[in-house]
Amino acid sequence: MNKPIPNSLRTLPDDRGRFGEFGGRFVAETLMPLILELEAAYEAAKDDPDFMREFQYYLQHYVGRPSPLWFAERLTKELGGAKVYFKRDELNHTGAHKINNCIGQILLAKRMGKTRIIAETGAGQHGVATATVAALFGLPCIVYMGATDVERQQPNVFRMKLLGAEVRPVTSGASTLKDAMNEALRDWVANVRDTFYIIGTAAGPHPYPAMVRDFQSVIGVEARAQMMEAEGRLPDVAIAAIGGGSNAIGLFHAFLDEQVKLIGVEAAGRGLDSGEHAASLSRGRPGVLHGNRTYLLQDDDGQILEAHSISAGLDYPGIGPEHSYLHDIGRVEYVSATDDEALAAFQLCCRTEGIIPALEPSHALAHVAKIAPGMDKESIILMNLCGRGDKDIFTVARHLGEQI
């Protein structure tokens, strides 16, 4: 007899890939057989102890997990309120959380007999992580990257090339992440037989949002255990930056059924009223993009608007569908931080903790800096420090008027 499904937020999506009214699979007819094949392969892999053992092996011995939980003592004193802990996923191999998902997906590609890897990238971190695992398993790799992002992320472009990947600049649209994803989907339609598309965020058609979340959920599982060891209890607040939303859902998933306040921080760019931001939950409305229904930045005619953020990893005009669902039911609070606030937080982290964060988690830190002073000293904030800032030093220098 089947056990009843517990009343849990962690059981979604449903069998159609839906999180409430969000998610699903809106893809070209030529892709549907492949999507169904991918779903079947993933469901089988998830239930295969050998696959999960192999995944854990690479996370431990190649990625370097578990990543540490760090009490940011000097930052805590400077802010003068709640204790601030960092989940330090920037210490992973390749410098961000992206590698967790790439390991899982390339093991699935290998299991399915696929011989060619494609990916999209914005900041370049997912591109680097995909090129890394493709090199590890000896598979050819093509990374689609908006021409605008190629210009502002030169170090990561060179890293991808060193790792043997071909980087294809995309010049359509605003030449950023949305456009790179469009090109990758076109490639996949044209090469369905031998190609595996490693999507970097918790978006795209089902099963990608659930699959990426599951591979990233190691972040929250580890952080939960580490928090219990360090403090004997769960945090009061867990905070993460939101672009497509994979690092955030990876952290949040372990806490969805707990009394932990969850906060996602979108990129407010030059301000929510400026029209130059990437805050699709704050300023968007539901629509369909890249195979799923979710909140999107769009005009009155339903045309997708260009997103802006100082952080190349956050300037996506949509959000993973699970975040849209969690927003609508009120389980997660979604706020935003501007370019200037993220820059200030970036510098604060460097100065107080000796850690150069990526501009993506600097948005989360900007919100930590807002709320921590108003909380008592026994309160605990857990923040996902999901990437290191080496890739961003040229951008930061330019904004600070420095020449490198």
Curated annotation (Swiss-Prot):
GO cellular component terms attached to this protein's record: cytoplasm
Entry EC no(s): 4.2.1.20
CDD domains: Trp-synth_B
Pathway: Amino-acid biosynthesis; L-tryptophan biosynthesis; L-tryptophan from chorismate: step 5/5
Catalytic activity: (1S,2R)-1-C-(indol-3-yl)glycerol 3-phosphate + L-serine = D-glyceraldehyde 3-phosphate + L-tryptophan + H2O
UniProt cofactor(s): pyridoxal 5'-phosphate
A Pfam family this chain is assigned to: PALP
Domain of life from the UniProt record: Bacteria
Top EC class, one word: lyase
Keyword line: Amino-acid biosynthesis, Aromatic amino acid biosynthesis, Lyase, Pyridoxal phosphate, Tryptophan biosynthesis
Protein task: The beta subunit is responsible for the synthesis of L-tryptophan from indole and L-serine.
Assembly information from the UniProt record: Tetramer of two alpha and two beta chains.
Family (UniProt): Belongs to the TrpB family.
Name this polypeptide is given: Tryptophan synthase beta chain
Source organism (scientific name): Acidiphilium cryptum (strain JF-5)
